[in-house]
From Swiss-Prot:
Its EC number is 3.2.1.8. Induction: Expression is under the control of transcription factor XYR1 and highly induced by xylan, carboxymethylcellulose (CMC), and hop cell wall. Disulfide bonds join C334-C340. Keywords: Carbohydrate metabolism, Disulfide bond, Glycosidase, Hydrolase, Polysaccharide degradation, Secreted, Signal, Virulence, Xylan degradation. Inhibited by the wheat xylanase inhibiting protein I (XIP-I). The keyword Transferase does not apply. Endo-1,4-beta-xylanase involved in the hydrolysis of xylan, a major structural heterogeneous polysaccharide found in plant biomass representing the second most abundant polysaccharide in the biosphere, after cellulose. Plays an important role in causing fusarium head blight (FHB) on cereal crops. Pfam families: CBM_1, Glyco_hydro_10. Residues 1-18 form the signal peptide. One of its GO terms (molecular function) is cellulose binding. Pathway: Glycan degradation; xylan degradation. It is found in: Secreted. This is Endo-1,4-beta-xylanase D.
Length: 381
């Protein structure tokens, strides 16, 4: 989702240290290059360095993932993942990245409650292939290794997205080059993790709010053809992985982005033989009375499930205020939608959320379960 581009610290250089998740370096960066106490400045890619929890003096190292757990990796049968699987779904997951692996309270929750993980940033194009043909997998590998060592399913996120896209890709203006670059990127990344990824978000956020295609660099050069190019390359690289189209604001049943956007386009593309297995609804939801509250989500999910796909999934769930009944509404919508295979919340604790100010997650800033967690756990009993 929208993370790196939204958390840049705008404090003048030399006047203030960057706060947690703020930018602290990178090509063209003119702001602060130091982080507040308790944080370290870590390279995400050549263009973006970020303040993350840890110390530059020996802290923040990646822990030994240990011996792989048997089966699905849930040591606690009372965890959310174990409960939702008992209801016939595949997983209850969360978002993490390599910079979370040294956070023991967070990781202990992941091990107990969640059976699937999605990389927040380290599988995006700017992190994986910052320069043409030069692939950097070290940070993504850390999350994949952790997931495999602990029996967690993995959602690959994301192969094509208009944001966090290197400038060299944006500069491409001819069809042949763009096609070749997409095919090579998708093939290389998917092949590296072949057999390890359950779901791939092949294309992410490709629709405008009116249901038309977003005017991304991919669309400017290739029109809608980039969708088929990406999905076919992914299918060829790993025939077993389920391939998804993922987007936000798919939370109102009659909204144009849902109907004439996602559903109509997906039905057309599937009829053309493009191997789209599923639709991912990010579900970044508002409070009651907001534009896209949880109350409208069940009807919207059923509209998405009516498309000609095998699966739907809730991929980046967070809810402004995290009201218990709102979370239960969304969880029940998946339980009552046969095509819905699982739920991923976009982060573990409010402290680590990209919407931190709205306290949108299941655990508070001290990594303690909130009322929403208890309500979800009870709903899954």
């Amino acid at each position: 989702m929208h993370f790196l581009g939204l958390v840049v610290a705008f404090a003048p250089a030399a006047l203030a240290q960057s706060a947690i998740w703020g930018q602290c370096g990178g090509t063209g960066w003119s702001g602060s290059t130091t982080c507040q106490s308790g944080l370290k400045c870590e390279k995400i890619n050549d263009f973006y360095y970020q303040c993350i929890p840890g110390s530059d003096n020996g802290g923040g190292t990646t822990p030994d993932p240990g011996t792989p757990s048997p089966g699905n990796g849930n040591a606690d049968a009372t965890g959310l993942d174990a409960k939702i699987r008992a209801k016939g779904k595949i997983y209850f997951g969360t978002e993490i990245d390599h910079y979370h692996l040294s956070n023991n309270p967070l990781i202990n929750i992941v091990k107990k409650d969640f059976g699937q993980v999605t990389n927040e940033n380290s599988m995006k194009w700017d992190a994986i292939e910052p320069s043409r043909g030069q692939f950097t997998f070290s940070n993504a590998d850390k999350v994949v290794d952790f997931a495999q060592a602990n029996g967690k399913k993995i959602r690959g996120h994301t192969l094509l997205w208009y944001s966090q896209l290197p400038q060299w890709v944006k500069n491409i203006r001819d069809r042949a080059t763009m096609t070749s670059v997409i095919e090579n990127h998708v093939k290389t990344v998917v092949t590296r993790y072949k057999g390890k990824i359950l779901h791939w978000d092949v294309v992410n956020e490709i629709f405008a709010e009116d249901g038309n295609m977003r005017n991304s660099e991919f669309y400017q050069v290739l029109g809608e053809d980039f969708v088929g190019i990406a999905f076919r390359a992914a299918r060829a690289a790993d025939p077993a992985a389920k391939l998804y189209i993922n987007d936000y604001n798919l939370d109102i049943a009659n909204y144009a982005k849902v109907t004439r956007g996602m559903v109509d386009h997906v039905n057309k593309w599937v009829s053309q033989g493009i191997p789209i297995d599923g639709i991912g609804s990010q579900a970044h939801l508002a409070k009651p009375g907001g534009w896209n509250p949880a109350s409208g989500f069940p009807a919207a999910l059923k509209v998405l499930a009516g498309a000609n796909v095998k699966e739907v999934a809730i991929t980046e769930l967070d809810i402004d205020g995290a009201a218990a009944n709102d979370y239960v509404t969304v969880v029940n919508s998946c339980l009552t939608t046969p095509k819905c295979v699982g739920i991923t919340v976009w982060g573990v604790s409010d402290k680590d959320s990209w919407r931190s100010e709205s306290n949108p997650l299941l655990f508070d800033r001290n990594y303690q379960p909130k009322a929403a967690y208890t309500a979800v756990s009870n709903a899954l009993n």
